[in-house]
Amino acid sequence: KYDKVTAQRQPGSTFKLFVYSEAMNQGLAPCDKRRDEFISMQVPDKKTGIIRTWIPRNANGNYSGDSITLKAGFARSVNTIAVRLGQEMGIKNIIRTAQEMGIKSPLENEPSLALGSSDVNLLELVNAYCTVANDGEHCDPVVVTKIVDQRGNEVYVAPHTNKQVLPYQTAFFMQQLLKGGLTEPGGTSRSLNQYIFKDTDWGGKTGTSNNHSDAWFMAVSPKLVVGAWVG
């Protein structure tokens, strides 16, 4: 049977969480700026090894040419900035950070990974976003927390595997970036802000794969992370 929770799909821009997390790990801050401009790269084809030109494009097909903050770049899901950060921070470092945050699927060491080109599943993606909500502390997902008998005796307690994998500052910065998706001008999930109670603390990230085959939304609050996939 096809299990949509564990099925492998391209995460699209939801993967930018790991690109920006590694950027924060390496000392950048949401107020730092990068330019949204044309990029052309020579990349070997995975199957043939032939060198091809890869030109990452934004969703609207345009490059503003503006130098914008990372907070705005994340909120607007600007592809060129994510690709540039991927090259600056190192794809191998981004892979390591993604794995530490909860991604178990194999990830390709290629520039397009910054845009979510490698398949992951919904369960591990939600788990990784939980790491940000949990102030940088990762915990493996657990279905059964404990089992008690009819007398109330605990016959099984799930082991705790909590581990601090992100510095608190990185997690805090990423929480602010996720909020920006709902609040920043041009934020890809800003339209949802009208449906959220003003006293609640929510953030979110959208994602779309090539040809719009997959659409994702990750909603994050301090106590709850929800992932949705349509495709």
Place the predicted regions along the sequence by residue.
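A penicillin-recognizing enzyme superfamily signal
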Residues: 1-4, 15, 72, 76, ...
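Glycine- and acidic
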Residues: 1-6, 79-81, 106-113, 159-160
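Extracytoplasmic/periplasmic beta-strand context in beta-sandwich domains
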Residues: 32, 37, 111-113, 142-145, ...
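Secondary-structure transition/capping motifs at alpha-helix termini
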Residues: 24-32, 104-106, 134-139
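Mid-domain, small-residue-enriched loop/turn segments at the edges of structured enzyme/sensor domains
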Residues: 48-58, 89-127, 141-143
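Conserved catalytic neighborhood of penicillin-recognizing serine enzymes
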Residues: 28-94, 138, 149-179
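Short active-site loop at a secondary-structure junction
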Residues: 1-18, 31-36, 112
